[in-house]
Regions:
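Membrane-proximal intracellular helices of multi-pass ion channels
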Residues: 1-445
């Protein structure tokens, strides 16, 4: 009797499923955008441009090689908006929502994947959390669209309804895509509305709300203003977010936007402190800003939003944990602390790993683009920070980049959206090693 070898069935980890899901949706989006019906001129869009746009939308970045408003048709804009919504919620969350709506039960493996995708602290209650994410997203996006409706309808008539919905979803998902460009004025973002307090405030609020994270909103909805009952993570996110909003606003007001009325300066300063984390809209000419302001925006872009949110970047908690660990080292304390709680040592190591990974990708991508395009390093650093942190702000060079440089930005956007730890665990596994080697000291600093 012939015995055939038995092959061990390979089981994909939750992290590999997340990456595969993003890649599959990205490819489908690119193929749809290549169709002639997706372009206003009814032409076939080159694959690399379609893939760039699909990746930028799915990874809620906002970098574009074609002006969204003047190049893409209603079908193409619809595909882009769908990709933005899927990317903002997360591919796994959207898949789980469809499974729940169809009446199917969520398996233990699927719950584990959903936990990793939403940055939930435990697997229990993950289905309930998914429902909360869908409800809070619909609430903010519809409310934002209703508030934007008067402005856009006054300028664009009935087309303003589509504009209001598109920009509301794009803002809450921290995508930064806009439809305001024309054949005569492309890539203008929100500059024509720089002095409109309603539109800029609504867009800025949606960006901040989307970047706080769904677990933070669960605490806010559950405990209202009782800050002491929030999770430590939510407290850290809210305090760090406030810090990263107020200080840059003051800087821009005092040193960058020094002309115009006080109201105009406040609106410009506030919006430019919000949008680098990590939306991609702009109400000012970014290329005309001072080098110090541009450097500050690069830092804000890399820091990004909060975990479990629609935003990208290293995340506010990563920044806060590194600061807390540095403060503990200054005080010669063994553990970093927040709000009377000790931070787990693995969180500190993860924060350092994520920061190191983002900075490596940031600098490496800039070197490749600078060498390939013969551009100043400072400009390339701005673009790669925008890509890896999934922001979408640009100094205007992205549409002129060659295929190699666009490929670098595509890779950075994808890696930046799936997350540093997700990528590491998908490649090397997430099971901790049980054996330990002998220890030896090494000099640091």
């Amino acid at each position: 009797m012939i015995q055939y070898p038995r092959y061990r069935q390979h089981r994909f980890s939750s992290f590999q499923v997340i990456i595969a899901g993003f890649a599959a949706v990205d490819l489908v989006g690119a193929l749809l955008l290549m169709l002639p019906i997706a372009a206003q001129q009814r032409c076939i869009t080159p694959f690399h441009e379609a893939l760039f746009t699909s990746t930028s939308a799915l990874c809620v970045t906002g970098l574009v090689v074609q002006d969204t408003g003047s190049y893409w048709s209603a079908f193409g804009q619809g595909v882009i908006l769908l990709l933005i919504q899927i990317g903002g919620l997360g591919v796994i969350t959207v898949g789980a929502a469809f499974a729940l709506l169809s009446g199917r039960k969520i398996s233990l493996k699927q719950r584990s994947t959903m936990q990793e995708a939403t940055a939930a602290p435990q697997m229990g209650g993950i289905v309930r959390l998914t429902g909360f994410i869908l409800r809070i997203t619909a609430l903010f996006e519809l409310a934002g669209a209703a508030l934007l409706l008067p402005t856009f309808c006054a300028d664009y008539g009935l087309r303003g309804i589509w504009y209001a919905l598109f920009h509301s979803i794009s803002a809450f998902c921290n995508a930064g895509f806009d439809l305001l460009g024309t054949e005569g004025a492309k890539f203008v973002s929100l500059t024509r509305y720089a002095g409109d307090p309603l539109l800029t405030t609504v867009i800025a609020a949606l960006i901040v709300f989307g970047g706080l994270g769904f677990l933070t909103w669960e605490d806010i909805c559950t405990y209202r203003l009782d800050f002491h009952r929030y999770r430590m993570q939510s407290k850290v996110i809210l305090v760090t977010t406030a810090f990263l909003l107020v200080l840059p606003t003051l800087y821009f007001y005092c040193f960058e936007f020094t002309a115009g009325s006080a109201r105009q300066r406040i609106l410009l300063s506030m919006f430019q402190s919000v949008t680098p984390r990590t939306a991609g809209f702009n109400t000012a000419d970014l290329a005309a800003m001072g080098s110090t302001s541009q450097a500050l925006m690069v830092v804000l872009m890399l820091l990004g939003g909060s975990p479990g949110s629609t935003a990208g970047g290293m995340k506010t908690t990563t920044f806060a944990v590194l600061l807390a660990n540095m403060w503990a080292t200054f005080r010669r304390r063994e553990d970093a602390e927040f709000f009377g709680r000790r931070i787990d040592g693995s969180a500190v190591k993860n924060a350092a790993t994520i920061a190191g990974m983002y900075l490596t990708l940031f600098f490496l991508g800039a070197f490749v683009i600078a060498a390939a395009e013969q551009l100043p390093m400072s400009v390339c650093l701005y673009e790669t920070a925008s890509a890896v942190a999934t922001v979408g702000l640009t100094l205007g060079i992205t549409p002129q980049l060659g295929i190699l440089s666009q490929g670098v930005l595509i890779a950075l956007m994808f890696l930046g959206r799936v997350g540093g730890l997700t990528l590491i665990y998908a490649a090397f596994g997430s099971s901790p090693a049980h054996s330990r080697l002998p220890q030896e000291k090494i000099a640091i600093g």
